[in-house]
Curated annotation (Swiss-Prot):
Quaternary structure and interacting proteins, as annotated: Part of the 30S ribosomal subunit. Interacts with proteins S7 and S18. Binds to IF-3.
BP-aspect Gene Ontology terms: translation
Biological classification of the source: Bacteria, Pseudomonadati, Pseudomonadota, Alphaproteobacteria, Sphingomonadales
PROSITE patterns: RIBOSOMAL_S11
A GO molecular-function descriptor: structural constituent of ribosome
InterPro entries (alphabetical): Ribosomal_uS11, Ribosomal_uS11_bac-type, Ribosomal_uS11_CS, Ribosomal_uS11_sf
Species name: Novosphingobium aromaticivorans (strain ATCC 700278 / DSM 12444 / CCUG 56034 / CIP 105152 / NBRC 16084 / F199)
Family: Belongs to the universal ribosomal protein uS11 family.
Protein name: Small ribosomal subunit protein uS11
Record's keyword terms, sorted: Ribonucleoprotein, Ribosomal protein, RNA-binding, rRNA-binding
Length: 129
């Protein structure tokens, strides 16, 4: 009657040499996703995932730690060269890029893909701090 223990499947190593790093830097958090050329995610990380809470998530250091984590996971799958796509107005844009270089990737292109409206919806009211 006793159930046999379930085997945990190990994630297979993808053998990919080049990829695209999508850095989404918002005002509240920074998310780094490394994909292959088709857009299938290889690894991802964020400042919140790395244990930063509240306003500390939006710091450049939190973005650096998140990019470092995502980069190390992608390097295990054999990624060597990256194109970087940066999106958003956050403070973690440059530090995430530097962290990816520090991991040891050769960065071939840096693109800013922040969506800019051609006068879209009305913005929210101004903050009074």
């Amino acid at each position: 009657m006793a159930r046999e223990p379930q085997r945990i499947k190990r994630r297979e190593r993808k053998n990919i040499t080049s990829g695209i790093a999508h850095v989404n830097a918002s005002f509240n958090n920074t998310m780094v996703t490394i994909t292959d050329a088709q857009g299938n995610a290889i690894s991802w990380s964020s400042a919140g995932m790395m244990g930063f809470k509240g306003s500390r998530k939006s710091t450049p250091y939190a973005a650096q730690v998140a990019a470092d984590d995502a980069g190390k996971k992608a390097a295990e799958h054999g990624v060597r060269t990256l194109e970087v796509e940066v999106k958003g107005p956050g403070s973690g844009r440059e530090s995430a890029l530097r962290a990816l270089q520090a991991v040891g990737f050769t960065i071939t292109a840096i693109r800013d893909v922040t969506p800019i409206p051609h006068n879209g919806v009305r913005p929210s009211k101004r903050r009074r701090v």
